[in-house]
Regions:
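Cap/lid segment of the alpha/beta-hydrolase catalytic domain
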Residues: 47-140, 150-151, 196-200
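Short beta-strand/loop motif that positions the catalytic acidic residue
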Residues: 231, 238-240
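Alpha/beta-hydrolase fold nucleophile elbow
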Residues: 155-164
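Short beta-strand element of the alpha/beta-hydrolase
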Residues: 29, 39-49
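Single conserved hydrophobic/aromatic residue that forms the stacking wall/gate
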Residues: 2-13, 17
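Gly/Ala-rich beta-loop-alpha elbow adjacent to hydrolase catalytic centers
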Residues: 164-168, 172
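Mobile cap/lid helix-loop segments that gate and shape the active-site cleft of serine hydrolases
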Residues: 122, 126-129, 137, 144, ...
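C-terminal catalytic histidine-bearing segment of alpha/beta-hydrolase fold enzymes
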Residues: 257-300
Length: 300
């Protein structure tokens, strides 16, 4: 495991929390720190996919020290998927240290390494030949993010959570399953069974950026819900939308049932929350209020 090396590039302050841009392992990140005396609980805020690569961390934290076009891009995205809010900023206002970085091919890492599907598939293919995966790199980066957050003097390392929408949801439950650093996770709009996602026309069948969440041979042993259930007995929250065309409701319900069986088998059924909302593929203000209140109960 390589040693951690960080450098603060810039910072800004608000009435509630201070913000800084950190660079570690040559990857820019946002860190939001509440004002007041810590240590504080923390959240790793994991951005979505959205087939929109010009921004990454800026989808979950209001950008600063950026060009006007980045600010406008982020504001439009927040309005489209997050009810006009930046979830990282909302969590910082609630007293959390918030960490957000770009996944490979998004934001600063997209502008530098290419944002087109051909480049993504080319890298994914080359990684497979090296015995690695794009999804594995994303998850490893998120694990290291949690390790970094735990090392911050402002953070209580026993109270770290993860939250994300869409691909950020996939990243959240993967991180909770893979890292003992993360104590709880809120995973929004990325959970179903593999058969339900392999229907003609679904994004999972198109290749392209699907490689960001695909692990070869995994399906021979585990489905997505089984991987997420490795997080048991941690508190976990899963929301999906009944009108979400990407995740068929029957597949979502089957996946939820698989996870409930695991938490129930460990006599911690009360630590798993699953809910279908009458919405599409979004994390709106009402959903945020319920998810953040749940996180407060387990991390504050």
């Amino acid at each position: 495991r390589p040693p951690r090396s960080t450098q603060s590039r810039s910072s800004a302050a608000s009435d509630v929390y201070k913000r800084q841009v950190s660079a570690f392992c040559r990857v820019p990140a946002y860190v939001l720190v509440p004002k007041g005396k810590g240590p504080f609980p923390a959240v790793v805020a994991l951005h979505d996919h959205g087939a929109h690569f010009s921004i990454g961390k800026e989808k979950v934290v209001r950008p600063f020290d950026e060009k006007p076009e980045v600010l406008e891009d982020a504001a439009r995205w927040a309005q489209t998927l997050y009810g006009g809010r930046f979830i990282g900023d909302e969590l910082a206002k609630r007293g959390y240290v918030v960490f957000a970085m770009d996944a490979l091919f998004w934001g600063d890492r997209g502008r530098r390494e290419g944002v087109d599907y051909q480049a993504q598939q080319q890298l994914a293919a080359n990684l497979l030949q090296l015995g690695m995966t794009w999804a594995g790199i994303v998850t490893w980066d998120d694990i290291r993010s949690a390790e970094f957050v735990a090392s911050l003097p402002e953070v209580d390392p026993t109270r770290i959570g993860a939250v994300g929408l869409s691909m950020g949801c996939h990243r959240a439950w993967m991180l909770c399953a893979a890292s003992d650093r993360v104590a709880a996770g809120a995973a929004i709009c990325w959970m179903a069974t593999t058969p339900s996602l392999m229907r003609p026309g679904n994004n999972q069948t198109k290749g392209q950026s699907a490689y960001a969440v695909l692990v070869p041979d995994l399906r021979n042993w585990l489905d997505y819900a089984d991987v997420a259930a490795i997080a048991c007995p941690k508190p976990m929250l899963f929301f999906n939308g009944e009108k979400d065309a990407l995740f068929p409701v029957d597949g979502v319900k089957d996946a939820y049932a698989r996870m409930h069986r695991v938490w129930s088998s460990q006599r911690v059924e009360d630590r798993l929350v699953t809910k279908l909302w009458p919405v599409a593929h979004v994390f709106n203000e009402e959903m945020q209020a319920e998810a953040f209140a749940w996180m407060d109960r387990h991390l504050r």
